[in-house]
Regions:
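Active-site pre-lysine segment of PLP-dependent enzymes
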Residues: 118, 125, 134-150, 159-205
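Short acidic capping loops at alpha-helix termini that bridge into adjacent secondary structure
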Residues: 73-79, 100-102, 147
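N-terminal small-domain helix-loop-helix segment of the aminotransferase-like
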Residues: 1-84, 91
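Glycine/Thr-rich phosphate-binding loops of Rossmann-like dinucleotide-binding domains
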Residues: 28, 89, 113-114, 160-161
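Short beta->alpha connector loops at strand-helix junctions that form conserved
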Residues: 107, 126-130
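Residue-level signal for alpha-helix termini/capping positions
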Residues: 11-12, 42, 97, 144-145, ...
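Conserved PLP-anchoring active-site segment centered on the Schiff-base-forming lysine
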Residues: 95-117
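Flexible low-complexity scaffold tracts in large eukaryotic assembly proteins
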Residues: 20, 155-158
Length: 205
């Protein structure tokens, strides 16, 4: 919010301003979406508890979408709806790690990931990156020990925006498989970049 106020004071700058602040929405939702939501708000059934894992029609649609996009063969039992990727990360971490365990995360990382791991008492082990902001796979191998439970990737990366090459994603996937680690991939921004030809699209994940 403070950055936005600062921008208002410099609207007439002679040079273009590059806004590299938090990717928070600054425009209102489309009017047709607001109209639809207001109509749904008046329906009694929308104020009752639903399926814990999410509405079945929505999960079925996601199954169809992912099976087509990723050449996979998942079913509705493999899909759970969460309140955004933050909750999905929290749920995933809670099922695979406990206080005192470790999770490998490339730097720089998404700040909410660090906060949740800290709250849970889980150690975050930084994987250093090269000059192109890509994680060093050889260093990652040396960081794994008996307390390591998973490797986390965000691609395109938040906050750098770097898309991890398919070869790198595959190498990290193989490392996780070889070391019997879970692999958590956050693709929040995947539709903002190029379609990546990586393991996710090979039907092997």
């Amino acid at each position: 919010m403070e950055v936005r106020e600062w921008l208002k004071l410099h609207r007439k700058s002679k040079k273009p301003l590059l806004n590299l602040s938090q990717a928070a929405p600054m425009s209102p939702p489309p009017s047709n979406l607001l109209k639809y939501l207001s109509e749904q708000y008046l329906l009694t059934e929308n104020h009752l508890y639903g399926d814990v894992l999410g509405d079945i029609p929505l999960r079925e649609e996601i199954v169809n979408l992912w099976n087509e996009e990723y050449s996979s063969s998942i079913c509705i039992n493999n899909v759970a709806i969460t309140s955004g990727c933050n909750q999905a990360f929290c749920a995933a971490i809670s099922t695979i790690a406990s206080a005192g365990d470790s999770i490998l995360v490339p730097v720089p990382w998404y700040f909410n990931h660090e906060m949740w791991l800290a709250i849970q008492g889980i150690n975050i082990i930084p994987i250093p990156c090269d000059i192109n902001m890509l994680p060093d796979i050889e260093t990652a191998k040396k960081l794994i020990d008996k307390k390591t439970k998973a490797i986390v990737m965000v691609t395109p990366n938040n906050p750098t925006g770097v898309e991890y090459p398919s070869k790198l994603v595959k190498n990290i996937s193989n490392l996780a498989r070889d070391k019997n680690l879970k692999l958590i991939i956050d693709e929040t921004y995947k539709n903002f970049g190029n379609k990546q030809s990586n393991i996710l699209y090979e039907g092997k994940w």
